[in-house]
């Protein structure tokens, strides 16, 4: 009986953690729609800390962070964030979107050059 109770507690706690992460990410998207990029960055940092065991969420978090950096006219930082996505998650949907954002920034002449966005991969 104790084992069943312990398993139920673990399952419930895991579900609460997932709910908390989803809620933070949802609030980040809502703040982005309102144009509150400082709030978005804060919520994304919290979501990132809660999602360390779910690495598949990192490209989504990074893409939203890059879009906020663009809104704040921090174009080099946005380009570096997009390059991070392309380097570490090349087969993801978010890498495709990041490449499109990088190309748009280059066409708008916000890219300083390829040297400014060079990111070296880090081994986990």
Annotate the PLM regions.
Residues 96-124:
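Terminal, low-structured helical/coil segments at or just beyond the last alpha-helical repeat
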Residues 48-57, 86-100:
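Short solvent-exposed coil/turn linkers within tandem alpha-helical repeat scaffolds
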Residues 16-34, 46, 51:
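Bacterial Sec signal peptide processing site at the extreme N-terminus
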């Amino acid at each position: 009986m104790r084992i069943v109770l312990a398993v139920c507690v673990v399952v419930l706690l895991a579900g609460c953690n997932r709910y908390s992460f989803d809620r933070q990410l949802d609030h980040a998207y809502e703040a982005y729609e309102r144009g509150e990029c400082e709030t978005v960055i804060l919520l994304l940092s919290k979501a990132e800390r809660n999602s360390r065991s779910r690495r598949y969420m990192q490209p989504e978090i990074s893409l939203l962070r890059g879009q906020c950096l663009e809104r704040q006219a921090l174009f080099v930082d946005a380009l570096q964030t997009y390059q991070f996505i392309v380097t570490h998650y090349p087969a993801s949907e978010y890498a495709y979107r990041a490449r499109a954002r990088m190309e748009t920034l280059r066409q708008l002449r916000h890219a300083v050059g390829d040297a400014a966005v060079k990111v070296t991969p880090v081994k986990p």
